[in-house]
Amino acid sequence: MLSNRKKIILKSIIENYSKEAKPVSSKLLTYTLHLNVSSATIRADMAELEKQGYLLKKNYNSSGRIPSFKGYNYYLNNLIKRNEEFIEMFSFVDKIIQKKSFTKEQLIKKVLELLSEFTSYTAIAIGSDILKTSKINKIDLIYLNYFELIILIVTDKGHVQHQNIVLNQKKDVNMLDIKKVIIILNDLLKGKFLFEATLIIQSDIVKKTIGKYINCEEQFIESFVEIFANFVDNNCYLSGVLNILNQPEFNNIEIIKKLINCLTKKELIKIMTIKKRLTFKFSDNIELIQLENFTIISIPYSINKYEKGQIAILGPYRMNYHKVIPLLEYLSVYLSNLYDLNN
């Protein structure tokens, strides 16, 4: 249990470190907090906070302290206050979005653009798990020539994916065989969720059946699996990726490369599993990304009953949480209303 004075000191260290990205000294806290105690008393409290794990061990090149993972966790759960001045910007956000009509995709992209601009961090959006919410409505194979086809898949939600495939087989593919394969695939997969279709098409019985008409069935089936993966990839958006370059924590070129490589759509989906509330993920708890000092804050949004997902901010540990959190909360709650206003 932290005393009120220690809470004030911890809160001040975190918020000062967020602004300056430099260790916070007891001297600075003495001048700014007006606690009517000596600098020595504040130093003793800081030493105690360090022992309790809320601050990182003192760096002897500096007289100050920086928050630890535990310190940030405590701050986010107990000490943070929403920035009232920043909340006043919400009406400005409304005016920008209500100026013109957006499709759902355009609206989400605009929201991310505003998030990244207002926070100077990287904004992320991931739609609902399309593999579990969309069913196959139609499969078509468009015959281009003896070896080349276009695979076309349409879902019940109107999502469309297509892919060219050049078949590596010795004999030509004829149109009659293609028509038979189309009938077989539609019989098997129409009305199935995308994740079910992914499993079905890789089954031995389907491979054997398709192999009667197309010699290179393995290549053919792999192309279908790639299309199903594309449905997921096209359900993820990023804005402000280069904002990472402005953060002193990420000024090492190797760190930047690693972080940007991790910002691939498939990796993000693994990190950002859908939750029903505001969620904080610190790099210490993300095994997928072997980097330090960054945080992902995510919150669910809902455009309608079926189209749900998450919006998130990725930034350094010391991000301005009191600004970021109210903006995320606001956009999450009102994303559905904003879409209604634009239609």
Swiss-Prot record:
GO MF annotation terms: DNA binding; DNA-binding transcription factor activity
Keyword Repressor: yes
Keyword annotations: Repressor, Stress response, Transcription, Transcription regulation
Gene3D superfamilies according to UniProt: 3.30.450.40, Heat-inducible transcription repressor hrca homolog, domain 3, Winged helix-like DNA-binding domain superfamily/Winged helix DNA-binding domain
InterPro entries on file: DeoR_HTH, GAF-like_dom_sf, HrcA, HrcA_C, WH-like_DNA-bd_sf, WH_DNA-bd_sf, WHTH_transcript_rep_HrcA_IDD
HAMAP family linked to this entry: HrcA
Protein task: Negative regulator of class I heat shock genes (grpE-dnaK-dnaJ and groELS operons). Prevents heat-shock induction of these operons.
Family classification: Belongs to the HrcA family.
The protein, known as: Heat-inducible transcription repressor HrcA
The encoding gene: hrcA
